[in-house]
């Protein structure tokens, strides 16, 4: 740091790659260890949270002991990021080195420019480090929504006083401490009550797991019932097409439906009883926020929420799109004013030019997504002026989604005329048909939703669209001649298992089913999690083996179902309460609520859930199997509901009784534990729904596997729960 004679400023970015871009703009072109310098600037970086709240060991509380709970630090101690070792948590050496470098840079600077991500978590990353270092230097905030050279230069020319973001910091700090209190105390309390294994719970993850489990049980317990409907056709005299009428009723008795069918067939005609035409205006869809992008990328392309976020982050850092972790689907008027130039730059593009030309003139752009009052920290997702080149397949898919949504969002409304016709047969049985005619295509000319509909339509997708067909100019009282009659059988269907798309939607509205985009936006402060954290919550539940992915579906494991069965009626699993906490954090961020009041409430909540969880040991009742653990040879295997587990806490090897849809008997488990293999058992069900027979055995790592009669073995992943060392 040889520039002591010159007045220096330190710019701190969230990643080395971002620091490199900023250093280029400010002329800090000399590379040093952990930073760059030049032209009066030091430009350094963090890599995630370098500083975090300390673990309970720091407060002298080692191990899991009921008498220590709840652990409520006052104040919270901040420590360098730690890694777990055999001897407990230790500071990360690389983190310590970078903290030391940053501390010296701060000391050598007159002022600090904060260039961490412009959001709640980015603010906390800097503030925790600033507090830990005991720094008192004044700081300004670089608050930008893209990393283009233009955006960085404009941001540096319009730095904001760091104190303007105190409320953002207070909200971030309150969220961090709340997650610590609930996660640490809840996990320790439930693990103590269980008496074996580790059961992780969290302020957001446990209610989220609850929504997955509740949907699973609702789906599994649903009793599908048959129903019958009658249909008849009528030939359109103008087109020659056969138009299909369907009975308004669904009959659960086949005999009744058959009688109706015979009557319709015998009568051969119907009378029009009602004709109604109404105009439907479908406004252009709102721009993407992160959650909506993740939902549609999952339903259309099968991308996980984490994968979509990762791609969006790469596109942002490559300067191709604006800040991805946004919760807003709107832009302000000043951003709206830049769009004509942005779209004009694409007119001659080989691929996007034709799409952009579908837009109306700029004076006729839809302003459905323009509302400055609904712009939060960042506006909705947009592409930047930089040409997106060199994209990999998945990156191009996400980029195209964002661009095409922009074109849709600023296109004209789609206008349809929808005609509904009712008819009666023998003045008794009601039938109906509907058809729509598009009068103005508008934004649907480029509707990805229309173009990407797959033949194997997702089970979680809904299609409320009225079929596009011309209805003849029938009049009430007119008699029509029938052309054929059919009877069809259908079955009632349960709500489908959650996909990441539907789970994200449920998290967004705290479990409330809301289809309207505008209403969903109004609910966003009361959802659980944030756009920036929801993907991580889903991945946490998968990593902790509370649920698994089966194709696109999210299916709870026996471990997840067992946890939910214990906590489902407790405060820790209350989705609505978690949504209220998120709404309170949003108020803190806006300066409408006190962080101290929130913290006081969370501490009371922590005491409540800790007492509840410690008191649920009776729900973990167990019995001894009388069998030695085949793995460690020290503990005994004990029955806990649908799980058999080693009593040795150092081992804890589990054997799940539910295997591929079949519940093993105690006798089967005893054979497996003592002989290493069961007899050949019937009644297993494959992922394809086919029944098969096999024995269950241990492999060399004491994972369970199938052994088939022909002595070939095959590991059925997703059906047999595997124990990981």
Predicted regions and their residues:
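Conserved short loop/turn motifs at secondary-structure junctions
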Residues: 7-8, 116-118, 195-198, 277-286, ...
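Basic, low-complexity terminal or inter-domain segments flanking catalytic cores
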Residues: 2, 6-10, 32, 88, ...
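Amphipathic alpha-helical transducer elements in NTP-driven molecular machines
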Residues: 16-23, 40-43, 47, 66-69, ...
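Structural motif
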Residues: 116-120, 168-173, 196-204, 221-223, ...
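Intrinsically disordered, low-complexity regulatory segments
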Residues: 2-176, 180, 186, 451-454, ...
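C-terminal or mid-to-C-terminal helical accessory/interaction module adjacent to the motor/catalytic core
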Residues: 94, 107, 149-232, 277-278
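Metal- or metallocofactor-binding catalytic centers and their adjacent structured scaffolds
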Residues: 252-286, 294
């Amino acid at each position: 740091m040889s520039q002591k004679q010159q007045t220096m400023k330190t710019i701190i970015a969230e990643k080395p790659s971002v620091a490199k871009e900023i250093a280029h703009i400010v002329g800090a072109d000399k590379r040093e260890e952990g930073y760059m310098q030049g032209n009066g600037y030091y430009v350094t970086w963090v890599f995630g949270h370098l500083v975090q709240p300390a673990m309970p060991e720091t407060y002298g509380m080692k191990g899991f002991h009921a008498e220590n709970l709840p652990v409520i630090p006052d104040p919270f101690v901040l420590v360098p990021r730690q890694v777990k070792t055999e001897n407990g948590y230790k500071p990360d050496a690389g983190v310590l080195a970078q903290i030391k470098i940053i501390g010296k840079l701060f000391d050598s600077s007159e002022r600090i420019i904060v260039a961490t991500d412009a959001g709640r978590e980015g603010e906390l990353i800097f503030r925790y480090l600033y507090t830990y270092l005991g720094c008192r230097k004044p700081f300004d905030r670089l608050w930008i929504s893209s990393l283009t050279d233009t955006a960085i230069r404009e941001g540096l020319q319009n730095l904001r006083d760091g104190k303007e973001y105190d409320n953002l910091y207070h909200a971030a700090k309150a969220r961090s401490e709340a997650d610590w209190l609930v996660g640490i105390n809840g996990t320790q309390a439930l693990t103590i009550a269980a008496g074996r294994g580790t059961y992780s719970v969290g302020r957001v993850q446990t209610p989220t797991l609850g929504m997955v489990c509740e949907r699973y049980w609702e789906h599994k317990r649903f009793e599908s019932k048959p129903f019958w409907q009658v249909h008849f056709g009528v030939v359109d005299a103008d087109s020659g097409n056969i138009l299909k009428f369907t009975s308004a009723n669904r009959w659960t008795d086949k005999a009744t439906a058959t009688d109706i069918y015979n009557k319709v067939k015998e009568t051969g005609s119907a009378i029009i009883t009602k004709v109604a035409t109404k105009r439907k205006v479908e406004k252009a869809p709102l721009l993407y926020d992160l959650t909506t992008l993740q939902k549609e990328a999952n339903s259309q392309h099968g991308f996980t929420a984490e994968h979509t976020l990762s791609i969006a982050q790469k596109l942002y850092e490559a300067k191709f799109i604006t800040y991805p972790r946004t919760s807003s689907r709107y832009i302000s008027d000043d951003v709206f004013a830049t769009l004509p130039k942005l779209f004009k730059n694409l007119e001659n593009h080989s691929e996007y030019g034709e799409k952009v030309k579908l837009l109306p003139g700029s004076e006729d752009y839809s302003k459905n997504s323009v509302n400055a009052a609904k712009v939060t920290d960042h506006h909705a997702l947009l592409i930047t002026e930089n040409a997106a080149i060199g994209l990999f397949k998945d990156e191009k898919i996400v980029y195209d989604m964002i661009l095409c949504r922009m074109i849709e969002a600023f296109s004209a409304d789609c206008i349809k005329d929808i005609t509904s016709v009712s008819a009666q047969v023998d003045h008794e049985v009601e039938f109906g048909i509907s058809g729509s005619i598009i009068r103005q295509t508008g934004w649907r000319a480029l509707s990805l939703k229309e173009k990407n509909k797959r033949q194997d339509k997702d089970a979680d997708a809904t299609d409320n669209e009225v079929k596009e067909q011309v209805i003849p100019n029938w009049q009430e009282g007119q008699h029509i001649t029938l052309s054929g009659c059919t009877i069809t059988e259908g079955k009632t269907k349960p709500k489908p298992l959650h996909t990441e798309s539907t789970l994200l939607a449920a998290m967004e509205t705290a479990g409330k089913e809301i289809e309207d985009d505008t209403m969903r936006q109004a609910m966003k402060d009361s959802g659980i999690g944030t756009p920036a954290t929801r993907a991580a919550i889903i991945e946490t539940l998968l990593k902790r083996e509370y649920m698994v992915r089966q194709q696109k579906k999210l299916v709870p494991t026996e471990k997840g179902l067992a946890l939910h069965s214990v906590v489902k009626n407790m405060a820790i699993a209350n989705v609505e309460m978690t949504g209220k906490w998120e709404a309170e954090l949003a108020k803190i961020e806006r300066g409408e609520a006190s962080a101290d009041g929130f913290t006081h409430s969370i501490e009371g909540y922590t005491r409540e859930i800790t007492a509840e969880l410690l008191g649920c040991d009776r729900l973990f009742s167990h019995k001894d199997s009388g069998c030695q653990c085949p793995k460690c040879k020290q503990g005994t295997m004990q029955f806990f509901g649908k799980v058999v587990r080693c009593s040795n806490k150092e081992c804890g090897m589990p054997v799940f009784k539910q295997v591929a849809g079949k519940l093993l008997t105690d006798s089967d488990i005893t054979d497996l534990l003592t002989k290493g293999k069961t007899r050949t058992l019937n009644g297993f069900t494959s992922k394809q729904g086919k029944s098969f027979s096999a024995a269950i055995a241990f492999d060399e790592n004491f994972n369970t596997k199938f052994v088939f009669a022909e002595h070939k073995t095959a590991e059925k992943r997703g059906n047999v729960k595997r124990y990981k060392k």
